[in-house]
Regions:
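Short, polar loop motifs at secondary-structure junctions
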Residues: 59, 189, 281-285
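Short His-Asn-centered micro-motif
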Residues: 56-57, 80, 203-205, 222, ...
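Short hydrophobic/aromatic beta-strand or adjacent loop that forms the aromatic wall/cage
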Residues: 150, 315-321
Length: 324
């Protein structure tokens, strides 16, 4: 289906960037609230040697990539998330089919435009009037895995600030970002990521799955959707201040304050089992209260995502909770 869409759009000329001969392995997608800015601080705090590693809110898995690059993980790695497209894409890259994905992304890239973005975004829906859309089919019923992965990466690279958001019908509804031509079909980057991802088990699962697998000597890192910093219109997602509650919906069900309490209970169980964990979240009063019996470090980070331009460069405070 994706190639049928491409056949209706003209090629557009653009200047390609030079291909790097050496590519450092890193996340295949950009993720809101990514931890690159805090990584050095995290590495100072995290265990220097880990048996098995768990990252239940996988996202871009930047912490996993960093720990692997430092040789800290001695055993197995388990990455999981409830975002089905993310898991399908990651497993496809891991399986060695990165060349097929890169090739299709390149074909999309050759024709990138605002019109193409929305046509690819809307393959699983139809317009019903008043600019509203209705879901017509499950994405995996109409696209093969390579198309799913290429679409996911393309939308991530071209949508508004790499935000992943779905509406109540489970439809990805983030608008296009800056629509000028880009070259993001990086075969080398996908290949290097595949090499590192091959060291992990990647599955679609709830964070509670770690309770069955983690043992003393293992390390669990939680990076859940963040608790809102304040009530009202301003929300915090992944440490990012957002105006408008609809920006918090990574899944149809969202992640509520009640979910934050259940996550704390999960951390309590891990602690009772002697499993080391760390958790990132906002500096919200609820988070401070839930984790007051643990080590809570407040960190300042510059975040750029906001729906109003005059607040784009505000510094935000978030916390890192540890039981060690």
């Amino acid at each position: 289906m994706i190639r049928d869409i491409l056949s209706r759009h003209p090629d557009r000329e653009f200047r390609r960037r030079k291909v790097q001969k050496t590519v450092t392995a890193g996340p295949i997608v950009q993720w809101v609230g990514g931890k690159r800015q805090l990584m050095d601080r995290y590495m100072e705090i995290f265990p220097k040697e880990i048996n098995n590693y768990f990252e239940p809110f996988m996202g871009g898995a930047s912490v996993f990539f960093e720990l692997q690059s430092r040789g800290v993980i001695k055993g197995k790695s388990y990455l999981s998330d409830l975002n089905t497209e993310l898991i399908v894409t990651s497993n496809l890259i891991k399986s060695g089919r990165f060349a097929e994905v890169a090739r299709l992304i390149n074909e999309i890239n050759e024709k990138h435009s605002k019109e193409l973005f929305y046509e690819i975004r809307n393959v699983d829906r139809v317009r019903t009037g008043n600019k509203k859309y209705k879901k017509t089919a499950e994405l995996f019923d109409i696209l093969d895995p390579v198309e799913v992965a290429a679409r996911f990466i393309y939308l991530n690279k071209t949508c508004f600030n790499a935000l992943f958001r779905v509406n109540g019908d489970g439809l990805f509804n983030v608008p296009i970002g800056r629509s000028e031509k880009k070259d993001f079909s990086d075969y080398g980057q996908l290949k290097s990521a595949a090499s590192v991802l091959s060291k992990a088990e990647i599955k679609h699962a709830s964070y509670e799955n770690v309770l069955e697998l983690a043992s003393p000597g293992d390390f669990v890192y939680f990076d859940p959707p963040y608790e809102p910093v304040e009530s009202g219109s301003e929300k915090s997602v992944g440490g990012v201040l957002i105006n408008g509650n609809n920006f918090t919906s990574y899944t149809v069900d969202g992640f509520t304050s009640e979910d934050q309490v259940r996550l704390r209970d999960c951390c309590d169980t891990l602690n009772d089992k002697g499993v080391s964990f760390a958790l990132s979240n906002s500096n919200a009063p609820l988070i401070q209260e839930l984790y007051k019996s643990y080590n809570v470090k407040t960190l300042e980070v510059n975040r750029t995502l906001n729906s109003k331009g005059d607040k784009r460069k505000n510094a935000a405070k978030e916390v890192l909770v540890t039981n060690f």
